[in-house]
From Swiss-Prot:
Full protein name: Ribosome-binding factor A
Record carries keyword Cytoplasm: yes
Organism in which the protein naturally occurs: Buchnera aphidicola subsp. Acyrthosiphon pisum (strain APS)
GO cellular component: cytosol
GO process terms (BP): maturation of SSU-rRNA
Main localization, broad class: cytoplasm
Origin: domain of life: Bacteria
């Protein structure tokens, strides 16, 4: 029987859990006082880089979102250090944070579809 997931997929899932816990419990930056959701993690095949896609509860203002992403990217070395302690990997990937706006796009589409059904 073949494995359903390759190693990078399993590591991405584990990174998603650990980074979400670190952001919620260990990151004490007062500039980030909103709920942050780690929606997806993409790991390179050689496990040297990980792209972390996050969404914010209050993500209406694009400028605030960019500031929060910048803050998270500046704290990525601290988060990586905590990951080294919590995960048993020989190489812990470098972390790059990106904003995931798929929830907002999906919400806009559902509102448009809802308005279309009301007009009919």
């Amino acid at each position: 029987m073949e494995k359903l997931f390759n190693r990078s997929d399993r590591i991405a899932q584990e990174l998603q859990k650990k980074i979400a816990a670190i952001i919620q419990h260990s990151l004490k930056d007062p500039r980030i006082k909103t709920i942050i959701t780690v929606s997806e993690v993409q790991v390179s095949k050689d496990l040297s880089y990980a792209q972390i896609f996050v969404s914010f509860l209050e993500s209406d203002n694009n400028e605030k979102v960019k500031k929060k992403i910048t803050i998270l990217n500046r704290a990525s070395s601290y988060i990586r250090k905590l990951l080294c302690k919590r995960m048993k990997l020989r190489i812990v990937p470098n972390i790059i944070f990106h904003h995931d706006d798929s929830f907002l796009k999906g919400n806009k589409i559902s509102c448009i579809l809802e308005n279309l059904t009301k007009k009919e």
